[in-house]
Regions:
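Post-HExxH zinc-binding segment in Zn-dependent metallohydrolases
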Residues: 104-125
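Zn2+-dependent metallopeptidase catalytic core
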Residues: 25-45
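Long, well-structured alpha-helical subdomains associated
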Residues: 6-9, 123-125
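A short, highly charged nucleic-acid-interacting micro-segment common to nuclease
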Residues: 19-29, 107
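Active-site scaffold of zinc-dependent metalloenzymes
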Residues: 49-87, 100
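A short, surface-exposed helix-loop junction/capping segment
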Residues: 8-22
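Active-site recognition of the HExxH zinc-binding catalytic motif
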Residues: 91-103, 111
């Protein structure tokens, strides 16, 4: 499966912003990182809610089909986890954004797919 990713320069910028958020908890850093990803994929920014823990501490993030993302805040991530590294948290954010990118706007994507499948099929008419 071929996957379209942002250019390396944009990915590095997003990674730096997520790293800065993990260290300083500035909400603007996180919002800029998510906005950059969403801008590349032409999606609305997801609604992100922060939690101390999710699913009794077994889950670090959760994405719903309506575009809502639940994440463990870095402040809480550092406290109560066995694997509490910055890299692991950033990886979790990317994982949940992957869910968001592939689930987002399913109806619209299905409609576009359907229309492109039939485009040119009845060319003789």
């Amino acid at each position: 499966m071929k996957m379209i990713l942002p250019p390396i320069r944009e990915r590095r910028a997003v990674d730096r912003l997520l790293s800065a958020f993990f260290q300083k908890y500035k909400a603007t850093d996180f919002k800029k990182a998510i906005a950059a990803l969403c801008r590349f994929y032409h999606l609305k920014n997801p609604k992100v809610e922060w939690f101390e823990y999710i699913d009794w501490g077994r889950t670090a993030g959760k994405t719903y089909e309506n575009g809502q993302i639940y994440l463990v805040h870095p402040e809480n991530w550092k406290k109560g986890r066995k694997y509490n590294s910055e890299r692991r948290w950033i990886s979790t954010v990317y994982h949940e954004m992957g869910h968001y990118v592939f689930w987002a706007d399913a109806e619209n994507k299905a409609d576009i797919f359907a229309s492109r499948m039939v485009r040119g099929v009845n060319h003789h008419r």
